[in-house]
């Protein structure tokens, strides 16, 4: 798990969750570090 990524709020910009538009979505959590 990446500590910079909050479970309830995800920042989606590209393949990573590094800032950008704040969306509550699981799209960000589908990344390898969440699995």
Curated annotation (Swiss-Prot):
One of its GO terms (molecular function) is toxin activity. Keywords: Disulfide bond, Secreted, Toxin. It is found in: Secreted. Expressed by the venom gland. Insecticidal toxin. InterPro entries: Insecticidal_knottin-like_sf, Toxin_28. Disulfide bonds join 10-22, 17-28. Residues 31-33 are annotated as: Keys region for toxin activity. Pfam families: Toxin_28. Its main location: secreted. It comes from the Eukaryota. Belongs to the neurotoxin 16 (SFI) family. GO terms for cellular component: extracellular region. This is U1-segestritoxin-Sf1a.
């Amino acid at each position: 798990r990446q500590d910079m990524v909050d479970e309830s709020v995800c920042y989606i910009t590209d393949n990573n969750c590094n800032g950008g538009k704040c969306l509550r979505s699981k799209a960000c959590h589908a990344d390898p570090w969440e699995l």
